[in-house]
Amino acid sequence: MNEQKEMNMAPTEATEEVREEVEIHYKELSPIRMVVRRFFRSKLSLVGVIMLAVLFTFAFAGPPLMYAFGYEWGETQTDLTPTIKRATATLDVKTTDKDGNEFGVIQFVEEEVGINSYAPMSASHPLGTDEKGMDVFIRLMYGGRVSLTLGFIVVILETIIGIIMGGISGYFGGKVDQVIMRIVDILNCIPMLPILLIASVVIDSWNIESSARIYYLMLIMTIFGWSGIARMVRGQILYLREQEFIVACEVMGIPTWRRIFKHLVPNIMPQLIVSMTLGLGGIILYESTLSYLGLGIPLPYAAWGTMISSSTDPVTMASYPALWVPAGILIVIAVLGFNFVGDGLRDAMDPKSKR
């Protein structure tokens, strides 16, 4: 009896030992951890993350770090055009001084007052100064803030509008779907760049302040940019709305808006994240193109495209490459970084991917 009992217990003990060994050597990974592991296995994804980390550190943490290391931004650094304070005095026919002597004719000599424009590279100006005596290195930092912030805000607004319109179109179908998709088709037929150029000219004619101009550009880019996301969301929801969990939601009486935004939209978040990441590079290119053509962010505000547009003169481009080459390099780094990260996320979130 004892031998038979030991024989019956042996397979169970062996199974427990195998299970313990599996638990020691193999860990169960959640879907998020699997995506993260796949993402960081890609060398291009790592390169993209490093590029974006350096870029964001330069743009957003650069000025505070410069101040912390003793780089002061004051009168000796701004080198702005000098001004003359206004002085007034009452004059009569014969103006005399305190001793009663008449003043003679005051001679004004027109002279050029120089500013520190096109200064060479130095400790106070790492990349020199531009035509107006502004430090190029500092303007690159603040220009990065403008370009990156504009890109993120536009992408977020495009995604929100695309989710709402695409979700309604895909879930309800019928006439609602037809109307929304025809609007999407019309927007897709309109070329983006000419519309932005026309809009910028109209904004110029309205004499809008420079500080408010960027918000108008964001609005215009958002209006003409949400159609692609809406089409993608619609296609995914058309597939998901026939699944069992949505049928169960209908049987349980869950409201329509909750089915769309609580149960359907979370299932397409991977595709949305990839779309947002890949879209950032295109938006930065659009903003840089408009600024290069003189229709983007105007002076005195800095943007990478604006800095390049200030050096369109062939003589300036040849003689002062520091005015436009660094800005062009940063634009290339930003676009490549977002594209590398977007490609890595797309491959990592694809269960059929071999990576």
Give residue spans per PLM region:
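Gly/Trp-centered helix-boundary motif
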Residues: 1-159, 163, 253, 296, ...
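Alpha-helical transmembrane segments of integral membrane proteins
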Residues: 129-355
